[in-house]
């Protein structure tokens, strides 16, 4: 571990929901939930206002609606999120050549490698400037953690949320970690946490007191050694600029459990086709085919088959997935299916296992038939044209966003990022004056080229509560405020 807190972890605050609030003035300060809106949908992100009601990521959407019935429920706009993420990553790469993205809204940065930080004061200044730059460029807020290791930097950014900065100064790690829950440490999920709790271990300090031998006895050699090292704040993992893709997969959750075995098989074939398209799009091939099945009782089964060599052949992957399905009992119904490929390699013309063209045609036929059947089960085209939260433009009323649609009608609120909360109007779903539109920028450029957050004067739009804590450091002194 380093002797200076020069590893930075950035985590954007409620990213998807904050983007929606920044682009929709009427939702600022309101509960917003982004995710799949069907009966089997899952929450992708909840704004801080929604979290007050107990809504959180990965929660079933039905449960979220019961907890926060008056929240705004929106369909994700991934192209917009990705474009904003790219601007944030550009700011990070300006700090250092060693940037390790973890997702669209999260990354590690090695500040020392970029020469912008070498001790606590310089690291803190870099963190403060980064947060200000993110506000100026995107209009959003992010939380920053600084420490001598990746593990601690991530823990620090979590403590900084929302819209804060936390520095864990070298020498203070053990004292800081000691009283924290064992669940704070990476790799300690509900099962491991319960196992440790039954052994009387609930805090990080109690892990240290139990000793390495006891942890190995409880958790096994690899997990026990690793967890003990983390409890001692030992983490020498470097920031890696390019994270290697380990697998490619697709999965679907179904609004109604699938009971018919033939339908399950056709779904698996369709998912295999989608997986191949994604695999080829990335220029990859793989040798291990993985099938994921979540049953009616939420139990999840995973089956895999390793081939003799890498392939991107759709027939091979379909047939392997079908063989894997043969070993799974789907009695009672299936709520989720997934097909993936791991053991990846660069694209290869490998066709050792390719089947005859006639066999491919037979295999592809049912997929096409199922696609037609599935289309009949989907919502009407008119309803699918207007997903909640997406941008539209009306020839008379201008730019707006969809509040909801159904029964042949679509309701639109007409407002832009730099306007006051707008008026609501309802149209027929086939209104010729209404069309889908591209998102508007969250930050306007002034005459001097500088960024200005719409509707917020010189300050950034922030969706977090007004009363925020000051950020803190391991030594308890010299803290920067969480609002630059």
Task: Report the location of each language-model feature.
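Short Gly/Ser/Thr- and Asp/Glu-enriched loop/turn motifs at secondary-structure junctions
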Residues: 102-106, 147-150, 284-288, 334-336, ...
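Short beta-strand-centered aromatic/proline hotspots
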Residues: 398-405
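Gly/Gly-Pro- and Ser/Thr-rich, intrinsically disordered tail segments characteristic of DNA damage-repair
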Residues: 1-225, 368-379, 387-388, 468, ...
